[in-house]
């Protein structure tokens, strides 16, 4: 049932790219995998002109820029056209087209978890103790600067790639094994953090383009316990859409 009696006269384009693999197949240029038909259904209840647009070539993007919709809703980070990388949201900014998600600079900060943690600390926001390491850098448990249990994941990347049931480690042997696995599978250093048990949250922050005010929209992510008894939003959970999301309504 549509609770909105009067729709807002706005044009929104839900932008997607062709996925050559199965559902939720990983694409380097896609940061957020959208369920575009569900989004279309939801937004169409409130706005007059909502469509799904697939971008396959530069001309498709050029046509979108000419249409200049009121909002582009997309999880795409960039396109590769004629061996040239075009960052979607940076391009939209040049044409004064509002969008969701982040521009290239913010995505780079997000993707590099070591940099992201340091920016968080600089902003005086609490975060779990951490360090970055590679295989062979620590020869004993006493050389590790923070106490077990630890959470180990690749220092770069998204989609929880490299995060699994073995990411929580309770001893030196498990620590070494996971750090080595990340190096072999992804050729990356490991970000190691103090393991924080408890609930999982994600917070979207939207900026009002008319006055610059920010609005936080937190959700709690519900995940079943894995074989080790931990609730972890790992790669397989995301890939298989096994998590549930509920809005946080507590004003505190």
Predicted regions and their residues:
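Short small-residue beta-strand/loop micro-motif enriched in glycine and branched aliphatics
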Residues: 100-102, 159-162, 244-247
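A short, local hydrophobic-aromatic micro-motif
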Residues: 100, 128-129, 217, 233
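Short glycine/serine/proline-enriched coil/turn segments at secondary-structure junctions
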Residues: 81, 158-160, 226
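Active-site nucleotide/adenylate-binding loops and adjacent lid/helix of ATP-dependent enzymes
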Residues: 4-19, 65-66, 108-191, 197-198, ...
